[in-house]
Amino acid sequence: CNKWWMEDILKTSDFASEQKDIKDLGNNRVYFLPYLMGERSPINDPSARAVFFGMSMDTTREQMTQAVFEGVAFALRDSVEAAKALGINIVKSGVCGGGAKSPMWRTILANVLNITLEQTENEEGPAFGGAILAAVACGEYPDVKSACDKLVKSVKKTEPTPELAKLYNDRYSEFSKIYPSLKVVYSDISKNRD
């Protein structure tokens, strides 16, 4: 979503410039449901589509950009909450790739998820993860943890802050009400789209 917003909608590749005027993290009243291709886990609704919510005549480009970043983070939080419901408590996560280079994106994500993020040295997460799993399968390492301990290097750590995590927790509660309110609408529109 972040790349789509920047490149396809704003027609820029200068991500840093677009982020420099975003200043009031945790207080944006514009929401974005990032369901550009439906939504997978944990909602599993192929008819869901992206929506901006809460815009007014005063809404700025910066608020919309911030809403896109926050919406992606809130959608990831949906998956973290699903894991919690299964008894899995996630306290830290690695981040990599283009988005991980942005201090603002890491700050939003760390505080929305309320976990420590470690930016990894290797930017090719999926391919590198596949190589790690292959190394374990071939017997080079006894388990995934051992392989990761040896191969994955952290270059930056981003910690949540209590104040910002609280603001984002409140915003996540509001975000969580939007999709259920639109579920029937998504379904009806999907029937007419097919």
Predicted regions and their residues:
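Active-site core segments that coordinate phosphate-bearing ligands/cofactors
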Residues: C1-D194
